[in-house]
Amino acid sequence: AGPQLDVSCFAHDKNIGSRTEQLSVVHVASAQDCMKECQALPTCSHFTYNKNSKKCHLKAGAPEFYTYTGDMTGPRSCEHNCSDACWMDGNNPLAVWDYSGQPPALCWAACMGTPGCDLYTFQGMTCKLYSQTSSKRA
């Protein structure tokens, strides 16, 4: 077994699921294994893992959160935890999401799962998605 993946950037005990369309469902032993499955699929932006059923739901698209007992929703990777005005605001974002209480890495997952999204900002609780033509790098 290789090094353990970092799964510290999202809540494991808040019962947060994602309604986003799923690519597939697999049975795995842990959130780390679920993240590994997501990373193996090029179009997987995030996943929902249920610690009770051990089901790993692999998702493509921006996370759409809801409450479900035992669920935890995490990004493809915890490496993308940029926050605090990583990108300057453009005039017309592709999408604006209220991600109250969610980690910046799930805003990155929303960008990855949104066609045309190249950049994102995560300020306060707001995740904004941009194409390269709608914003400039800070």
UniProtKB/Swiss-Prot annotation:
Q: Which UniProt keywords apply?
A: Cell adhesion, Cytoplasmic vesicle, Disulfide bond, Lectin, Repeat
Asked if the record carries the keyword Repeat, the reply is yes
Q: List the disulfide bonds.
A: C9-C78, C34-C56, C38-C44, C82-C86, C107-C127, C111-C117
Q: Which SUPFAM superfamilies match?
A: Hairpin loop containing domain-like (SSF57414)
Q: What is the predominant subcellular site recorded for this chain? A: cytoplasm
Instruction: List GO terms (cellular component aspect).
Output: cytoplasmic vesicle; extracellular region; microneme
Q: Which family does it belong to?
A: Belongs to the microneme antigen family.
Q: What is this protein called?
A: Microneme antigen L2
**Taxonomic lineage of the native organism:** Eukaryota, Sar, Alveolata, Apicomplexa, Conoidasida
